[in-house]
Amino acid sequence: MAKLQVSLKARALRYLSAREHSRQELARKLARYAQEGDDIEALLDTLEAANFMSEARFSESLVNRRAARFGNSRILSELKSHNIDPDSLTEIKAALAQDEVARAREVWTRKFGVAASDANGRAKQMRFLLQRGFSHRAIQAAMRAKEENED
């Protein structure tokens, strides 16, 4: 039995029905299946015009998926890697900055729960949060607040 050839548009819609994709990400995924004469850019333009694909929805989706586990710099870095508009990045950065300390505290609590008793332990906890993309200011505020709660 012959395998059915799925059109690029059908493939794109299948990808987009699972989750939001950036233009760059969807183009990369579709490029594997493109045949000679297929115009991926025109297809992506059509999908954007029909509002099947949206940079704003993708950005919002990515932020919602990542915010509970990662800090601002990691999220913004990932958005930049998807070629998101710099103006949108500025708005997202401002929105993320409002609750970074609370998110850092929550991630720290899930991972460690109690403040370290020595300098090496504190450094380990701070490195963990730094690797997750939280700022020094947010890390210090989160750890300071946790230590005050324990006293």
Curated annotation (Swiss-Prot):
BP-aspect Gene Ontology terms: regulation of DNA repair
One GO CC annotation: cytoplasm
Compartments in which it is found: Cytoplasm
InterPro entries, sorted: RecX_HTH_1st (IPR053926), RecX_HTH_3rd (IPR053925), Regulatory_RecX (IPR003783), WH-like_DNA-bd_sf (IPR036388)
Main subcellular location of this protein, as a coarse class: cytoplasm
Xref: Pfam families: RecX_HTH1 (PF21982), RecX_HTH3 (PF21981)
UniProt keywords, alphabetically: Cytoplasm
Family as reported in the entry's similarity comment: Belongs to the RecX family.
Function summary: Modulates RecA activity.
Listed HAMAP family: RecX (MF_01114)
Protein's recorded name: Regulatory protein RecX
Organism field: Herminiimonas arsenicoxydans
Species classification: Bacteria, Pseudomonadati, Pseudomonadota, Betaproteobacteria, Burkholderiales
